[in-house]
């Protein structure tokens, strides 16, 4: 029999192709410590899980494995959970256990879910106000954004590989400056499937009063 040493870390990279710094409201994902990952080790006639890598390390001096090939999988978070501060990480590797030897499983877990955000340009805010938009996920959750507010909302985590639909309303300029302006309803904008480790930004823009567009940007573009 031999032993397995687990060395793991989290890669919090999102929008890897983007070169534009993230705004403060779209801060980096929470990065778990290596020992906080849930652990699963599988092999021929072997399948066992540990609540954390720390729990495994606490007993690894006495835990040995028959010779053979094993798959080491680490996860953190819930892949089906959606909302603020709900990143999901996953990673795996394979090792060969030899008799009376310790092999090292080096694993980097990457983000497996996606982010969504609705924001408005300064040009849009010049012509519209009281905007309220909702992002509906493939899982059926609905998240509300008010992109004309002074403080931009945080991105929400959503399931990767599932559709996103954005729709909403905004008030146009008042003719007399006193009463409410006309209410505009925006046609739902669908996204077929959210990409893993990507921030999907739905941006409202307007070049003149009564004219507005809703575009989707992958990354911080």
Listing of model-derived features with the role each one plays in the protein:
Residues 1-44, 48, 55-58, 64-99, ...:
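Extracytoplasmic cysteine-anchoring/structural motifs
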């Amino acid at each position: 029999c031999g032993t397995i040493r687990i060395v793991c870390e989290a890669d919090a990279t999102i929008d890897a192709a983007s070169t534009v710094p993230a705004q403060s409201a779209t801060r980096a994902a929470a990065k778990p410590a290596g020992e906080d990952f849930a652990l699963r080790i599988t092999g021929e006639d072997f399948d066992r899980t540990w609540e954390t890598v720390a729990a495994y390390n606490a007993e690894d001096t006495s835990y040995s494995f028959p010779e053979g090939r094993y798959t080491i999988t680490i996860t953190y978070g819930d892949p089906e959970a959606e909302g603020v501060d709900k990143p999901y990480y996953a990673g795996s590797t394979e090792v060969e256990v030899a008799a009376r030897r310790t092999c090292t499983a080096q694993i980097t877990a990457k983000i497996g879910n996606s982010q969504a955000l609705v924001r408005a340009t300064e040009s849009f805010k010049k012509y519209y106000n009281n905007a309220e938009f909702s992002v509906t996920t493939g899982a059926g959750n609905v998240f509300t954004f008010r992109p004309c507010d002074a403080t931009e909302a945080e991105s929400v985590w959503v399931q990767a590989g599932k559709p996103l639909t954005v729709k909403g309303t905004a008030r146009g300029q008042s003719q007399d400056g006193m009463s409410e302006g006309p209410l505009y309803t925006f046609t739902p904008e669908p996204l077929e499937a959210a990409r893993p480790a990507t921030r999907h930004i739905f941006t409202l823009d307007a070049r003149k009063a009564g004219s507005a567009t809703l575009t989707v940007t992958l990354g911080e573009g």
